[in-house]
């Protein structure tokens, strides 16, 4: 099961809990075969997107699917083989557990207050104004809430931007030439 390499969660903190055990290999192999529609031995982003559910009866965010595939596709084949799929399975399952933890009203969506709780739990300290920006950016349905797949995508993007910011914040004071939130606001406005 070396396919799953732990990636710290958003903020460098816990993110998806790494504690959940994988189902047995035969179960995962059966799932893999059902998802691998063209029997190529590699699950493409389209195949994975069709297999995933975000709980809203809308297609899983293709950007999220591509991000997840790229994290686990060690051979740059635009998909994941069975070994890599076990990592994808665990990664998504871990994110489901995080999502359910912070979806306090069990609506299947993360609202602004739940998002604040989640990001605070990951170690982020952001303003209400910035939480509004995140909701607007990742709410594909325009309901003021974020679905599961968009929650993953938002956390992935925030983590990547944080990593970039930290590279330039050499004295680790939360400032480069602009404040962290100004930087994120600028980047999110063009992403």
Curated annotation (Swiss-Prot):
This is Programmed cell death protein 6. GO terms for molecular function: calcium ion binding; calcium-dependent protein binding; magnesium ion binding; protein dimerization activity; protein heterodimerization activity; protein homodimerization activity; protein-macromolecule adaptor activity; protein-membrane adaptor activity. Ca(2+) 1 binds at residues 36, 38, 40, 42, 47. Homodimer and heterodimer; heterodimerizes (via the EF-hand 5) with PEF1. Isoform 1 and isoform 2 self-associate; probably forming homodimers. Interacts with CPNE4 (via VWFA domain). Interacts with PDCD6IP; the interaction is calcium-dependent. Interacts with RBM22. Interacts with PLSCR4. Interacts with ANXA7 and TSG101. Interacts with DAPK1. Interacts with SEC31A; the interaction is calcium-dependent and promotes monoubiquitination of SEC31A. Interacts with ANXA11 (via N-terminus); the interaction is calcium-dependent. Interacts with different set of proteins thanks to 3 different hydrophobic pockets. Hydrophobic pockets 1 and 2, which mediate interaction with PDCD6IP, are largely formed by residues from EF-hand 3 (EF3) to 5 (EF5), as well as by Tyr-180 (EF5) of a dimerizing molecule (Pocket 1) and from EF-hand (EF2) to 4 (EF4) (Pocket 2). Hydrophobic pocket 3, which mediates interaction with SEC31A, is mainly formed by residues from EF-hand 1 (EF1) to 3 (EF3). Changing residue 169 to A: Abolishes magnesium and calcium-binding to the EF-hand 5 domain (EF5). Residues 23-58, 59-89, 90-125, 126-161, 162-191 form the EF-hand domain. It is found in: Endoplasmic reticulum membrane; Cytoplasmic vesicle, COPII-coated vesicle membrane; Cytoplasm; Nucleus. GO terms for biological process: angiogenesis; apoptotic process; cellular response to heat; COPII vesicle coating; endoplasmic reticulum to Golgi vesicle-mediated transport; intracellular protein transport; negative regulation of phosphatidylinositol 3-kinase/protein kinase B signal transduction; negative regulation of TOR signaling. Transmembrane segments: none annotated. Disruption phenotype: No visible phenotype. Mice develop normally and display no obvious immune defect. T-cells retain susceptibility to apoptotic stimuli. The lineage of its organism: Eukaryota, Metazoa, Chordata, Craniata, Vertebrata. The keyword Chloroplast does not apply. The modification N-acetylalanine is found at residue 2. Calcium sensor that plays a key role in processes such as endoplasmic reticulum (ER)-Golgi vesicular transport, endosomal biogenesis or membrane repair. Acts as an adapter that bridges unrelated proteins or stabilizes weak protein-protein complexes in response to calcium: calcium-binding triggers exposure of apolar surface, promoting interaction with different sets of proteins thanks to 3 different hydrophobic pockets, leading to translocation to membranes. It comes from the Eukaryota. Ca(2+) 2 binds at residues 103, 105, 107, 109, 114. InterPro entries: EF-hand-dom_pair, EF_Hand_1_Ca_BS, EF_hand_dom, Peflin/Sorcin_CaBP. Mg(2+) binds at residues 169, 171, 173, 175. GO terms for cellular component: COPII vesicle coat; Cul3-RING ubiquitin ligase complex; cytoplasm; cytosol; endoplasmic reticulum exit site; endoplasmic reticulum membrane; endosome; nucleoplasm. It is a peripheral membrane protein. SUPFAM superfamilies: EF-hand. It comes from Mus musculus. CDD domains: EFh_PEF_ALG-2. The keyword RNA-binding does not apply. Pfam families: EF-hand_7 (PF13499).
């Amino acid at each position: 099961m070396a396919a799953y390499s732990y990636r710290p969660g958003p903020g460098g903190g816990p993110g998806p809990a790494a504690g959940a055990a994988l189902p047995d290999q035969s179960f995962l192999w059966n799932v893999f075969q059902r998802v691998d529609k063209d029997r190529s031995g590699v699950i493409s982003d389209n195949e994975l997107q069709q297999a995933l559910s975000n709980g809203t009866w809308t297609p899983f965010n293709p950007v999220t699917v591509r991000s997840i595939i790229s994290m686990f596709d060690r051979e740059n084949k635009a998909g994941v083989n069975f070994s890599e799929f076990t990592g994808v399975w665990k990664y998504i399952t871990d994110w489901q557990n995080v999502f359910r933890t912070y979806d306090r009203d069990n609506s299947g969506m993360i609202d602004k207050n739940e998002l604040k709780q989640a990001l605070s739990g990951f170690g982020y300290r952001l303003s209400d104004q910035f939480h509004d920006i995140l909701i607007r950016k990742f709410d594909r349905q325009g309901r003021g809430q974020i679905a599961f797949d968009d929650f993953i995508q938002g956390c992935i993007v925030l983590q990547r931007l944080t990593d970039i910011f930290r590279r330039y914040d050499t004295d680790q004071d939360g400032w480069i030439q602009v404040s962290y939130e100004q930087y994120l606001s600028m980047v999110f406005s063009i992403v």
